Design a protein with these regions (language model features):
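Conserved hydrophobic/aromatic positions in well-ordered beta-strands
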Residues: 23, 42, 67, 84-86, ...
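Loop/turn-rich, solvent-exposed surfaces of beta-rich toroidal or solenoidal domains
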Residues: 81-83, 104-173
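Surface-exposed extracellular loop regions of Gram-negative outer-membrane beta-barrel proteins
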Residues: 35-40, 127
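Short loop/turn segments immediately following the C-termini of beta-strands
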Residues: 38, 78, 88, 124, ...
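Short loop/turn segments that connect beta-strands within beta-propeller blades
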Residues: 1, 45-49, 87-92, 132-136, ...
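Extracytoplasmic beta-rich repeat domains
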Residues: 3-30, 36-38, 54-69, 76-79, ...
Length: 216
């Protein structure tokens, strides 16, 4: 049965909305849920559905999940709008207490990941970017090529991301840009890569691949 249901108002009847997955994070001794919504980033109590906080400033269409790390939540608009960060633990309308808010012009589909104080995110036009979590400033921005729809995957200190043309890029998760490898699958890819138990799963248009050390 439905445990709780929270109604949310839409902006208008155009093709605007949220494709973002709710993200659970820990604050002190309890869990909260963050969700990038049309125009806002919001936090909810996962047990009751009660809205705990909200922050204005996102665009009308949001694809990426909220990025979590270093006590910060980062909401990223999907289409030509903004990106912003708030500190965990806020209550009520925290718009005036945003950590930072920056405008952007490139479309983002895949979700980003936070590692050691930096947000790593991909742009649909084929650009990977490293952003300082504390300031929102871009540290590096490099064109990988193709159209990047997949989410950034962090495994250890390496980043993995795929483009729709079927290439998989491996980057160093560092404020100094370094491309480690580029692998061509020769099949279209729109899904994000998925790790499990030392293996990497890759879903293309026609096949599902598992990459890793061969097991006995």
């Amino acid at each position: 049965k439905t445990v709780w249901d929270t109604a949310e108002k839409g902006i208008n009847d155009k093709l605007y909305g949220s494709w973002s997955t709710p993200v659970i994070y820990r604050v002190g001794d309890h869990d909260e849920v963050a969700l990038s919504m049309p125009g806002q980033l919001k936090g909810f109590d996962p047990l009751t559905g009660k809205e705990l906080w909200k922050c204005d400033g996102l665009g009308p269409s949001n694809y990426p999940d909220t990025a979590v790390g270093d006590g910060v939540l980062i909401g990223v608009s999907g289409f030509q709008k903004s990106m912003m960060a708030v500190r965990m633990g806020g209550r009520g309308d925290i718009t005036s207490n945003r950590l930072w808010h920056v405008e952007m012009t490139q479309q983002r589909v895949g979700s980003g990941v936070v590692h050691d104080g930096y947000l790593y995110v991909s742009n649909a036009p084929g650009i990977a970017e490293c952003i300082d979590v504390k300031t929102g400033q871009s540290v590096w921005k490099e064109r990988l090529g193709g159209t990047l729809w997949g989410s950034m995957l962090l495994v250890g200190d390496r980043l993995y991301v795929s483009n729709t043309q079927g290439e998989i890029f491996i980057l160093d998760a560092s404020p100094q840009y370094r491309l480690i490898a580029r692998n061509a699958m020769e099949e279209h890819i729109k899904a994000s890569l998925a790790p499990s138990d030392g293996q990497l799963f890759i879903r293309t248009y026609k096949n599902l691949y598992c990459v890793g050390a061969r097991r006995k």
